[in-house]
């Protein structure tokens, strides 16, 4: 086991940072040093923000979004289209759609996708409340905004079967050529999806 090069408090900071997605031990050490160097302008404010987040952030019991209120800001927004429900895997997907400005509907966060490999089964996801929400008379369309992975596709099929008894239109995001993309750089699966999802011009 490598010998610690700093005091236990700094080593603990490094170990906690290394648990973050995308940060390994080396990156965590660099991040810790940067935080320590900028103690007044970065470390202190970050620690304060994290304390507030730990105390005030809650999961919306309606959609699964994270916010400082329950129901969340999106669920309380009267300007949102109540007839459309956008199903996403995780909060990060919800945030990405919100940044695009293309969605003015309500969301439902599943909290993951079905995965035989990882042992994720339907009861591990936020599916029961989705079926309840879709059964409401105001909902007329469900948009499946799930990733185009094997697990994402499996989950999309499962969700579709789970809400088949509801009188709603089920759509999913188009897959294919990204804006600004060149065909020569795309993989065969993406090109096949683009051909199948082609639209009139």
UniProtKB/Swiss-Prot annotation:
GO biological process, one term: DNA repair
UniProt keywords, alphabetically: DNA damage, DNA recombination, DNA repair, Metal-binding, Zinc, Zinc-finger
One GO molecular-function entry: zinc ion binding
Domain Toprim: 83-178
ZnF locations on chain (C4-type): 60-75
Biological role: May play a role in DNA repair. It seems to be involved in an RecBC-independent recombinational process of DNA repair. It may act with RecF and RecO.
Protein family: Belongs to the RecR family.
Protein name: Recombination protein RecR
Species whose genome carries this gene: Methylobacterium radiotolerans (strain ATCC 27329 / DSM 1819 / JCM 2831 / NBRC 15690 / NCIMB 10815 / 0-1)
Lineage: Bacteria, Pseudomonadati, Pseudomonadota, Alphaproteobacteria, Hyphomicrobiales
Annotated gene: recR
